[in-house]
Amino acid sequence: MNHVKQAVHYWCSDTIEAMNNGRDVCVAVLDTGLAMHPDFTGRVIGFKDCVNGRHGLYDDSGHGTHVTGILAGDGRAYRGLYGGMAPKARLVIVKVLDEGGEGSIRQILEGIRWIFKNRLKYGIHVVNLSVGAKTGLEEPKENELLHAVEQLWDAGIAVVVSAGTYGPGEGTVAVPGN
């Protein structure tokens, strides 16, 4: 993030002390999981594995750990130099993608439904969904995925989804990012 701040000549000095550090916020990350890292110590409050059904926290890809670091790493491992956007947020990790970054609609829906069912238990405010269905998904499945995402939104949860996973060309932004 520091490289971005340098590039745009903005260091957030006007907001650095504001209450936008993730305190009192819970973020659910649906991705490849999370490898335990010092930057997340004491803040992972829930885990669900929709791919392999395991119970212990893990990430067999690294993508989920990277995304979670951008969102909520506290910079502890680097003496505070490299932290995420919400370094005090509590985290719920839902593994919906395998080691190759692939996942089925069934796994993604299972993860979204688990988040919806457990939203009050964990106090989930934000969901990050780093997935995009391949273009050409059958319309009933596309609608089911969109409905599940909209159900989270209608419950008052801010939902952030990836867009452009398959490139910048026309038709490459797939559901749910479209």
What are these regions (language model features)?
Residues 7, 74, 110-112:
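Short, well-ordered amphipathic alpha-helical segments that serve as non-catalytic structural scaffolds
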